[in-house]
Amino acid sequence: EKIHESYAGLNVRLRYFLRVVIERPYAMPYIKELDIAVENSQQSLVELQNDKPSKPIKLEVGIEECLHIEFEYDRGRYHLDDVILGKIFFLLVRIKIKYMELAVIRRESCGAPGTNGVAYNDSENIIRYELMDGAPIKGECVPIRLFLGPLALTPTYRSIANMFSVKYFLNLVLIDEEDRRYFKQQEVQLWRKSPEVETSTTGLGTF
C-alpha cells in the first residue's frame, strides 16, 4: 500500500513503476519500465472534520456604486464525482456586462525545502464554461451546476513529501463591454471517494 497517489503535472511527476534489467555480456543492459497507477481513497478527509458537513461558501464582490453581487457555493469540499451547486445574485448592476463564466483552476506549487524559499507556482484551466450571456438586471439570480465527474481532476494534495502541493480554485469572471474582467477566486478541497462495492442478488456473495 502506497502513501501517495501517482501524479503527472506541469512540473512534477510522482511515479510507481516496475523496472526489469537484463544484463548482457559485451553489450549495454536491456532496461524496461512499466508504470503502475496508484489511487488512494480519502474518506479520512471527512472523518478528520469530525463528520461535520462542509458549510456553504458565501462571498461578495463588487465595485463601489457600479456592481455588487453575492455568490454562494453549496460546500467547500467535493469528491471527484460530485456536483458543485451554487447561485449568483446581482444586487446592483450599473455597468454593461457581456457575459459571465466559471473556471476550475488547478494550481501546482513545487520546491524543495532549503532552497531559499524559492517555489514554482503554475496554474492551468481545467474547464471554463459560460454561465450567462448578456447583461443581467438587478435582482437576477443565476444558478451554478458543475459536474466534476467528466473532468481530469486529482484530489487536493498538500505538501506531498515536502516537495509539492496541488490546489483547486473556482474562478468566477465577469466581462464588460469594454472587455474589462472582474473576477473572484475561491479554493475548494477535492477528495477521492471509495469505490462502491456491488452486492450480488443471486446469493453468490460480493463481487
PLM region descriptions:
Residues E1-F207:
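C-terminal beta-sandwich interaction modules and adjacent acidic
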